[in-house]
Amino acid sequence: MITIKKGLDLPINGKPEQVIRDGNAVTEVALLGEEYVGMRPSMKIHEGDTVKKGQILFEDKKNPGVVFTAPVSGTVTAINRGAKRVLQSVVIRVEGNDQETFAKYSPAELVSLSSEQVRQNLQTSGLWTALRTRPLSKIPAVDAVPSSIFVNAMDTNPLCADPAVIINEYQADFTNGLTVLTRLHNKVNLCKAAGSNIASVDNVDSHEFAGVHPAGLVGTHIHFIDPVGINKSVWHINYQDVIAIGKLFTTGELFTDRVVALAGPQVKNPRLVRTNIGANLSQLTANELADGNNRVISGSVLYGAKAEGAHDYLGRYALQVSVIAEDTEKEFFGWISPQANKYSITRTVLGHFGRKLFNFTTAENGGHRAMVPIGSYERVMPLDILPTLLLRDLEVGDTDSAQALGALELDEEDLALCTFVCPGKADYGSFLRQALDKIEKEG
């Protein structure tokens, strides 16, 4: 077992009840194009087309063979594009139950599948997009081979769902999905919380992690088990997509249900809800939120995406919907007050003392300023890197030094705590993505 001591469990109010219930019915779902790093779509449909569940919507021009399929059947009502015609979202109005079918096998046949059979079924169904690489966090090429595959069956994000609750509901499908992954590659790592009753299968290496966030992030697991570099990559996948793989191979149908934690200080009844990948979040959260101006976030409060307009949908990789209040009011002499209801990792406010939960908002509690190295980053960074030096290089754009300091091991989520505790209010996730894009392009 690996215990993580450096990090932070955010003391935020609104933790979800760990019981799965059906969420509000949604009439719209969407695929969000900007979630897929470096993807350039070749559209296969147009607005007004009727599509089946599992039908190809677009293909990646840069990665031929990687297709993105419809999560529901219905009518394409909008193809939203942003600056430079970047694909923002493909919106589908839910209608009917028509769906494409794919190869299916009995559970006993799964252990004898070839790697080619697994690749073919994942790629034609669109479930290949559930896999992502480290470094770069991109969808792997159809013929790529990783050093290993990581299955993340734990979560330590603020307000997260307990993966064991969801896996227990789909235990057979999860087991079948793991078996399929062992046929894709002979080195599969299952990472779970210490003491978890999540069962493994033959030919899968189980690893237990304990401690504070980011103990549940796949970047932490990769760092301690099979570190990556410029010439070495691994793939990773979350536990709900493993369930979907198990369903696909035993039923021949695409499974796009998603159980998410609907939680946060502004949620009336925080709980786990069953919905669909790409669900419209305005519809999913209707009558669920406290009065006032709220920010709905697809994903974690630490690094999720604001859900509004063309992006008002549940992300492909999001396992939670977080809601906090929009804070637009300025506090008079806020810096000089005792601030008993505010939290700070630096212990400079009264709110730090005592084990209480806080109603966090969108307030940054300060303006953007120069980087201030006072040891905050080191307190929340458990990986064997020098965070202050790395973050400095990312902020100034020195990719050579950042690469030498371990930037290739990281994703935006791995630096979310550094952003949270930063006295200078810098967004290190965006700096990291700019650096990774430059490293990929220029080396």
From Swiss-Prot:
<keyword id="KW-0520">NAD</keyword>
<dbReference type="Pfam" id="PF11973">
    <property type="entry name" value="NQRA_SLBB"/>
</dbReference>
<dbReference type="Pfam" id="PF05896">
    <property type="entry name" value="NQRA_N"/>
</dbReference>
<dbReference type="InterPro" id="IPR008703">
    <property type="entry name" value="NqrA"/>
</dbReference>
<dbReference type="GO" id="GO:0006814">
    <property type="term" value="P:sodium ion transport"/>
</dbReference>
<comment type="function">
    <text>NQR complex catalyzes the reduction of ubiquinone-1 to ubiquinol by two successive reactions, coupled with the transport of Na(+) ions from the cytoplasm to the periplasm. NqrA to NqrE are probably involved in the second step, the conversion of ubisemiquinone to ubiquinol.</text>
</comment>
<keyword id="KW-1278">Translocase</keyword>
<dbReference type="InterPro" id="IPR022615">
    <property type="entry name" value="NqrA_C_domain"/>
</dbReference>
<dbReference type="InterPro" id="IPR056148">
    <property type="entry name" value="NQRA_2nd"/>
</dbReference>
<protein>
    <recommendedName>
        <fullName>Na(+)-translocating NADH-quinone reductase subunit A</fullName>
        <ecNumber>7.2.1.1</ecNumber>
    </recommendedName>
</protein>
<keyword id="KW-0406">Ion transport</keyword>
<dbReference type="Pfam" id="PF24836">
    <property type="entry name" value="NQRA_2nd"/>
</dbReference>
<keyword id="KW-0915">Sodium</keyword>
<comment type="similarity">
    <text>Belongs to the NqrA family.</text>
</comment>
<keyword id="KW-0739">Sodium transport</keyword>
<dbReference type="InterPro" id="IPR056147">
    <property type="entry name" value="NQRA_N"/>
</dbReference>
<keyword id="KW-0813">Transport</keyword>
<dbReference type="GO" id="GO:0016655">
    <property type="term" value="F:oxidoreductase activity, acting on NAD(P)H, quinone or similar compound as acceptor"/>
</dbReference>
<comment type="subunit">
    <text>Composed of six subunits; NqrA, NqrB, NqrC, NqrD, NqrE and NqrF.</text>
</comment>
<keyword id="KW-0830">Ubiquinone</keyword>
